């Protein structure tokens, strides 16, 4: 212990150090300097190497503009793919779409190192979003088939032809703050060669300055216009600790009304993604959804994330003149044209409110007009649905909104490539508000409602409960600011679909109003919250599962008979009353099909619940709701959907390429439930059972009364 202390070893610095290599680049001579000798042979022939061929017809001149809240997506062309994004964006994250809860479980750290410098992060989440739209007219559907034929040839297998675009690789373009673009409907990359040179100046003129400039998130996009891009956030596991109310299902970014992201439940966010394709002004595709951005082209649309205290300006234009997600009575359409079309005199002044209808129009039987609603909002106007054969009485939302900014008398149909093309005006806030005024009730709901209490918020707005003064009954009021929507036209879904379709198992909308610049939708208040609370915190027996399935299938059978596809079936979209009755809600993503438009193609829904044909970009119909219901059954059995521990894009790849998912503990499931599930989770849509067929399945005979659900609600509230 008294030994001599060892001397500390000293380490000298480097000796005879020489800085032999210092690599640089001479911009004047366009040469590298100071390269190691071994590298010279690799670069010696660079100067003599021919430059890559660039087709000038494929380059669109653009003008840099301030950041724009509204950016439109391009139609994916031949080279686009789901795979390109699936390969590159496995770490994209998703947030619960329609949760209105104020609490959220802790979020596992995704690891900052896994995200490149192009990703903007907050609380471990990354947001990507772009939107485009969906073909919904007969001509559009025919054009889509013609385009596939021209791209892939006559002898291509139909299934492969539909999914070929999902087999190539995409690449990524990073868009930074202030570099977003706005554009009206744009042509395909493959169509540019057919345009005259003057058409580029027309495209260039479509870029517009930003209304808002406080957006802070960076976006990284697939430049090959891959059909996949998301405005959602992802947490791989569910954690207890959520309170019980349900949030709107639209796939918008978080709105401005609340605190930071940590205050809300993390659930997969519904995604509305698709393509916008080029058409002349009078032949615009009615499309909605989202596509990915072409490099150096102002294509694509984005919902930008903002600072928690900032604003998320969602001019849903998730705007464009797009997605006919439902049909609008033709008289509504005619009124909108009369009110909002530009004056024939060529004046630039548009009417700022609903114009007085001439006598002939007033006598046309506008029975569903809001101006003939009864004074009591509970007396919702009854609507007699025409059969699918009489769909000529209905106009798509795209056409409806197109009428706001375009009049055939003012804008003659332009020819492709013509330098004299008339540029359509973008729908102004006043025009859109005037159009919406036609389908809502007149008056101010505050005259008969009081005691507004905010119970939650969603991506489109906030939800309050209010008390009806003369009855004391509680109602739910969804308040949505028109100026802060990502796709304003989808607000028509909130009004028209819920107004016109009434069923015991569909959430009832009493009325809707325009209060200032906000759309207020007054609907029944369901105290039981969302089914998600039950599947997350409890375990359901087969009687309870059958009870839920029976109610949902009744609602779906009714909607499908009317030609309505819900497109976002999941536990978040199922609400419960205090006595256990089950109702379907969240119609923001629904779509109408008819004989004229028998299929849809936009990538819509929440990844884990999406049907394979939706992910593969194949035309689909009401069968997609049946697949999603099957996934929801697995959710009720296992507590979460299949692949929920994987990133959404990886899960989508597995859904698209793998056999139908199975229950984790198959031995715990009865054979009758397995048979019921097998009829829904069929990869081939034509072989999938319909809602009407499933209503006759023996499994549903196990269904009990609504009261059998009540113990589950009590159980999760004790967590």
From Swiss-Prot:
GO terms for biological process: apoptotic process; cell migration; cell population proliferation; cellular response to starvation; cytoskeleton organization; intracellular signal transduction; learning; locomotory behavior. The modification Phosphothreonine is found at residue 107. Residues 1-29, 97-123, 256-299, 340-373 are annotated as: Disordered. Residues 271-291 have a biased composition (Polar residues). Keywords: Apoptosis, ATP-binding, Cytoplasm, Kinase, Mitochondrion, Nucleotide-binding, Nucleus, Phosphoprotein, Serine/threonine-protein kinase, Transferase. It comes from the Eukaryota. Residues 358-373 have a biased composition (Low complexity). GO terms for cellular component: cytoplasm; cytosol; intracellular membrane-bounded organelle; mitochondrion; nuclear membrane; nucleoplasm; plasma membrane; synapse. The active site is at 568 (proton acceptor). One of its GO terms (molecular function) is ATP binding. Residues 449-700 form the Protein kinase domain. It catalyses: L-seryl-[protein] + ATP = O-phospho-L-seryl-[protein] + ADP + H(+); L-threonyl-[protein] + ATP = O-phospho-L-threonyl-[protein] + ADP + H(+). It holds the Pfam family PBD. SUPFAM superfamilies: Protein kinase-like (PK-like). ATP binds at residues 455-463, 478. The keyword Nucleus applies. Residues 25-448 are annotated as: Linker. The keyword Cytoplasm applies. Its EC number is 2.7.11.1. Autophosphorylated when activated by CDC42/p21. Interacts tightly with GTP-bound but not GDP-bound CDC42/p21 and RAC1. Interacts with MARK2, leading to inhibit MARK2 independently of kinase activity. Interacts with RHOD and RHOH. An autoinhibitory domain is present in the N-terminal region of the protein. Serine/threonine protein kinase that plays a role in a variety of different signaling pathways including cytoskeleton regulation, cell migration, proliferation or cell survival. Activation by various effectors including growth factor receptors or active CDC42 and RAC1 results in a conformational change and a subsequent autophosphorylation on several serine and/or threonine residues. Phosphorylates the proto-oncogene RAF1 and stimulates its kinase activity. Promotes cell survival by phosphorylating the BCL2 antagonist of cell death BAD. Belongs to the protein kinase superfamily. STE Ser/Thr protein kinase family. STE20 subfamily. This is Serine/threonine-protein kinase PAK 5. It comes from Homo sapiens (Human). The gene is PAK5.
């Amino acid at each position: 212990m008294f030994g001599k202390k060892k001397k500390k070893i000293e380490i000298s610095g480097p000796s005879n150090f020489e800085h032999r290599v210092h690599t640089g680049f001479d911009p004047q001579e366009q040469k590298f300097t100071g390269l190691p000798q071994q590298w010279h042979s690799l670069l010696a022939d660079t100067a003599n190497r021919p430059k890559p061929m660039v087709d000038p017809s494929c380059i669109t001149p653009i003008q840099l503009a301030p950041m724009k809240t509204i950016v439109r997506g391009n139609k994916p062309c031949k080279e686009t793919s789901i795979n390109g994004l699936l390969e590159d964006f496995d770490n994209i994250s998703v947030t619960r779409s329609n949760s209105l809860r104020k609490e959220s479980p802790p979020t596992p750290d995704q690891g900052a190192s896994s995200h490149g410098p192009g990703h903007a992060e907050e609380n471990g989440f990354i947001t990507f979003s772009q939107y485009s739209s969906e073909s919904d007219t007969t001509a559009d559907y025919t054009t889509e088939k013609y385009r596939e034929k021209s791209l892939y040839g006559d002898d291509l297998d139909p299934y492969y032809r539909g999914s070929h675009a999902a087999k190539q690789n995409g690449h990524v373009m990073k868009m930074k703050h202030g570099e977003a673009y706005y554009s009206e409907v744009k042509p395909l990359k493959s169509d540019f060669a057919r345009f005259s040179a003057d058409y580029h100046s027309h495209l260039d003129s479509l870029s517009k300055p930003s209304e808002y400039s406080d957006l802070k998130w960076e976006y990284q996009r697939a430049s090959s216009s891959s059909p996949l891009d998301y405005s959602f956030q992802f947490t791989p596991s569910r954690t207890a600790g959520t309170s019980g109310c349900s949030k709107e299902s639209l796939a918008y970014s978080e709105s401005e009304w609340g605190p930071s992201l940590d205050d809300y439940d993390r659930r997969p966010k519904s995604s509305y993604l698709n393509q916008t394709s080029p058409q002349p002004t009078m032949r615009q595709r009615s499309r909605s959804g989202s596509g990915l951005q072409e490099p150096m082209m102002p294509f694509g649309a984005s919902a930008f994330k903002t600072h928690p205290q900032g604003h998320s300006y969602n001019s849903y234009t998730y705007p464009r003149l797009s997605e006919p997600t439902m049909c609008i009575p033709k008289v509504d359409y005619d009124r909108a044209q009369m009110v909002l079309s530009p004056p024939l005199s060529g004046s630039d002044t548009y009417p700022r409110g609903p114009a007085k209808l001439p006598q002939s129009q007033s006598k046309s039987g506008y029975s569903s007009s809001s101006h003939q609603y009864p004074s009591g909002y509970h007396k919702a106007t009854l609507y007699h649905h025409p059969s699918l054969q009489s769909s000529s009485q209905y106009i798509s939302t795209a056409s409806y909104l197109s009428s706001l900014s375009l009049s055939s008398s003012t804008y003659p149909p332009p020819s492709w490539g013509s330098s004299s093309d008339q540029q359509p005006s973008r729908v102004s806030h006043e025009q859109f508000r005037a159009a919406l005024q036609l389908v809502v009730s007149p008056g101010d709901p505050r005259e008969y409602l009081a005691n507004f209490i905010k119970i939650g918020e969603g991506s489109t707005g906030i939800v309050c409960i209010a008390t009806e003064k003369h009855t004391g009954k509680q109602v739910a009021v969804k308040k949505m600011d028109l100026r802060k929507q990502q796709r304003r036209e989808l607000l028509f879904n909130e009004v028209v679909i819920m107004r016109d379709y009434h069923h015991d198992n569909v959430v009832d909308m009493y009325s809707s109003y325009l209060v200032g610049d906000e759309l207020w939708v007054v609907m029944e208040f369901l105290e039981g919250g969302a089914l998600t609370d039950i599947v997350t915190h409890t375990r359901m027996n087969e009687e309870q599962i059958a009870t839920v399935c029976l109610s949902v299938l009744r609602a779906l059978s009714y909607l499908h008979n009317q030609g309505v596809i819900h497109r976002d079936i999941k536990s978040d979209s199922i609400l419960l009353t205090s006595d256990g009755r089950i109702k379907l809600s969240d119609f923001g993503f629904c779509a109408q099909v008819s004989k004229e438009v028998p299929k849809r193609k936009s990538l819509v829904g929440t990844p884990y619940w999406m049907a394979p044909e939706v992910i593969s970009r194949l035309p689909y119909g009401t069968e997609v709701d049946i697949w999603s219901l099957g996934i929801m059954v697995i959710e009720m059995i296992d507590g979460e959907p299949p692949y929920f521990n994987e990133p959404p894009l990886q899960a989508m790849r597995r859904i698209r390429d793998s056999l139908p998912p199975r229950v984790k503990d198959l031995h715990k499931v009865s054979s009758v439930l397995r048979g019921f599930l097998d009829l829904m989770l069929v990869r081939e849509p034509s072989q999938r059972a319909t809602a009407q067929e499933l209503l006759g399945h023996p499994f549903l005979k196990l269904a009990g009364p609504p009261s059998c659900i009540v113990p589950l609600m009590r159980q999760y509230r004790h967590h």
